Amino acid sequence: MEEATRMRRNDRAMDDGWIRAFLATAPVGVVSTVDDGQPFLNSNLFVYDESRHAIYVHTARTGRTRGNIEAVERVAFTAFEMGRLLPADEALEFSVEYAGVVAFGRATVVADAEEAGEGLQLLLDKYAPQLRPGRDYRPITPDELRRTSVMRIDVSEWSGKRKEAEPDFPGAFRYREPAPGGS
């Protein structure tokens, strides 16, 4: 494991197969870029392309994310989900279930129209798998590709981790649900 993705709790580390499966279903990712030393985060729909070991996102043709990537190609990416809250007898012992991936790599704005179209189609396939181009919607056109930015993050290193408590963990509850025994 590389230095940037080294974990303190190796008992929660997940393998590459788990990471790929998690990225296939995680609904939202966050891309971290830098502008003149100022970190910037942008939440995006995303898709992991196993054949390229890359993450695709798309954004507006102009904007901070694209400008930051054009200036500094090194980025970080994360996708995560929160499970149940795990109460305890002491405040500092409260915990939470979670699963997530952190990736580092180099991002580029995809200039090749064919690859940009493939990246957008992968996004559509992930988020609307029941719909097919040419049957349920008009396929992506060259004009549409010129009106958006498709970005590819070539993953250089990644890590995944998960914490999951027993199903019968005393008092466990989901955020924004009433706690067991609460009002």
Placement of each model-derived feature along the sequence:
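Charged, gly/pro-rich active-site loop segments
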Residues: 2-11, 82-183
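Short, basic/aromatic recognition patches
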Residues: 2-30
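Short beta-strand segments
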Residues: 25-61, 77
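A generic structural signal for short beta-strands and their flanking turns/coil linkers
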Residues: 27, 42, 51-53, 71-75, ...
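Short glycine/proline-enriched turns and hinge-like loops at secondary-structure junctions
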Residues: 39-40, 68-70, 165
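Histidine-centered metal-chelating micro-motifs
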Residues: 62-67, 76, 85
